[in-house]
């Protein structure tokens, strides 16, 4: 049996590994490589896929979405070789890294894509629940932000109902953070001024 000190060091190492991986600002990097400048200077100023889409480059936005998700998936799957606790630590680290990336002044995205990526890595069936909730909400309301909020809210409930308390607790914490990062969106939703899917600007 591993010593407690080694176990704790392993978890800290997994957390740091996940954070560094999650901190890679793919939206910013891809936009610059495509000659679109600093994505933080347009729209919401966010580095995520939704704001990259405001450049008008759908392929670039899709690439950003995929890469931001893969950060979470890769962190969780690689760390899983050292056990579920390490995978959870690395996944959470990747999520936090995306939100607060050290490379660009700790001002990152809102975490939805990386949330989904971590979910794929830790509980792929939960990712199907997320996708279903997102699609249904989007079809009914046309609000991307609301769809993400509803989907993230459903996930920990679904995980808990399946008896996976550890993952349910992790994603409950991540969901709270997602809601906090979407404060402005929630305010606009309540005021009826939130942009709908397909709207420009």
UniProtKB/Swiss-Prot annotation:
GO biological process terms held by the UniProt record: phospholipid biosynthetic process
GO CC annotation: plasma membrane
Record's subcellular location: Cell inner membrane
Membrane topology recorded in Swiss-Prot or TrEMBL: Multi-pass membrane protein
GO molecular function, one term: acyl-phosphate glycerol-3-phosphate acyltransferase activity
UniProt main location, coarse: membrane
Enzyme class: transferase
InterPro entries: G3P_acylTferase_PlsY
PANTHER family hit by this protein: GLYCEROL-3-PHOSPHATE ACYLTRANSFERASE-RELATED, INNER MEMBRANE PROTEIN YGIH
HAMAP family in the cross-refs: PlsY
Function: Catalyzes the transfer of an acyl group from acyl-phosphate (acyl-PO(4)) to glycerol-3-phosphate (G3P) to form lysophosphatidic acid (LPA). This enzyme utilizes acyl-phosphate as fatty acyl donor, but not acyl-CoA or acyl-ACP.
UniProt protein name: Glycerol-3-phosphate acyltransferase
UniProt source species: Brucella suis (strain ATCC 23445 / NCTC 10510)
């Amino acid at each position: 049996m591993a010593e407690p000190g080694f176990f704790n060091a392993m978890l800290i190492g997994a957390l740091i590994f996940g954070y560094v991986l999650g901190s890679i600002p793919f939206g910013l990097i891809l936009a610059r490589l495509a000659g679109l400048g600093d994505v933080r200077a347009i729209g919401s100023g966010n580095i995520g896929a939704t704001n990259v889409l405001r450049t008008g480059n759908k392929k670039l936005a899709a690439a950003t979405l995929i890469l931001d998700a893969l950060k979470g998936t890769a962190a969780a799957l690689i760390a899983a070789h050292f056990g579920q606790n390490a995978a959870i630590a690395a996944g959470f680290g990747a999520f936090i890294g995306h939100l607060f990336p050290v490379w660009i002044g700790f001002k990152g995205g809102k975490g939805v894509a990386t949330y989904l990526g971590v979910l794929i890595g830790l509980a792929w069936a939960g990712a199907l629940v997320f996708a279903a909730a997102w699609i249904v909400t989007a079809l009914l309301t046309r609000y991307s932000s609301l769809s993400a909020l509803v989907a993230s809210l459903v996930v920990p409930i679904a995980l808990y109902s399946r008896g996976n308390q550890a993952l349910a607790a992790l994603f409950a914490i991540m969901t709270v953070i997602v809601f906090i990062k979407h404060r402005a969106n929630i305010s606009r939703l309540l005021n009826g001024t939130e942009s709908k899917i397909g709207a420009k600007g």
